[in-house]
Amino acid sequence: LVLQEYDPVKNTMVGPVKDIYQADTVFLEGPHIFKRGGWYYLFSADTGTGESHGQTIQRSRNIWGPYEMYKADFMHRESEKEAYSILTSRHHRDILLQKSGHCDIVETPQGEWYAVHLCARAGRERNPADAVRFPGKRRYPLGRETAVQKMRWTREGWLVLDCGCRPQGNTPFTEVEGPDTEEHPYPAIPDRDDFINPVLALEYQSLRIPMDRHFISLDARPGWLRMYGRSGLSSRFSQSLIARRWTSFSFEASTKLEFEPELFKQMAGLIFLYDTDNYLYLHISRDEDAGKCISILRAENRSYSYPVGWLPVREHCPVILKGVVRQEMLQFYYGYDGEELRPIG
């Protein structure tokens, strides 16, 4: 970890760059420095972003160091190469919040302390197809999530999880005591979007590039989201992809798609995407013999397959695409307005 002074007037870094922590066996990243009670606290994520992820805390009287790492008996370690983490799911594969680490903290007006941290909830299935890249690892279809933990300061001036009347530990809780402040509930996210607003709702996201008029439009045809084609799904550059994050292991998603492809290289549809290498894509394209068709493209660790063949769909007619997720199972459907949807795949 390196430290350099920032000049807010000139909006630039100034002065020397100093190495304030050199890890011999543990990787640290995402550092924050805050001052409390005459101490500078160095708050850093440790051990990558996988199932050994955690959070460490160090302190120094001088911002330039040297920094002392907090070490305590409750920090369960199975080797000398492991980090001293004040928060981690490491060695606790049975708890709900896995991959816990990378915290930031806040003090409430009432003097309470809370930490927000990254985590992930594992699915029930392992990764049989990931034996080479990720042996023994689990699937995390919801991606990285954020959790909140209540914290407290020890008599010696170290920040730890507030475990209440329970023994001090460093594993995350799924329920914590809320702050003594007024509630500010977040508005409920609508289940349906008819695209009648001039801008997309905040829950929509694009992949790598901002959403702009170069590939989407909400006013070209009111009540519809128009998307203009770009690179294919395997591209790591610009794509026309608008998505919402999974927030549950069981849900349904559907859309009405109007699309008239002219070539087999043109496609559009409904995708359930983990990353560029892993997804299931129900899409419409064009076959030279069968015409306008629908199929499923499956990508698993950049291994591509079509679980079903091409099925003809009606020309010049909107098609309804739907996916139903129940834990590890995804069932696709397709059909037309006023008709019962047909399963596919």
Listing of model-derived features with the role each one plays in the protein:
Residues 1-345:
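Carbohydrate-active catalytic/glycan-binding domains of CAZyme proteins
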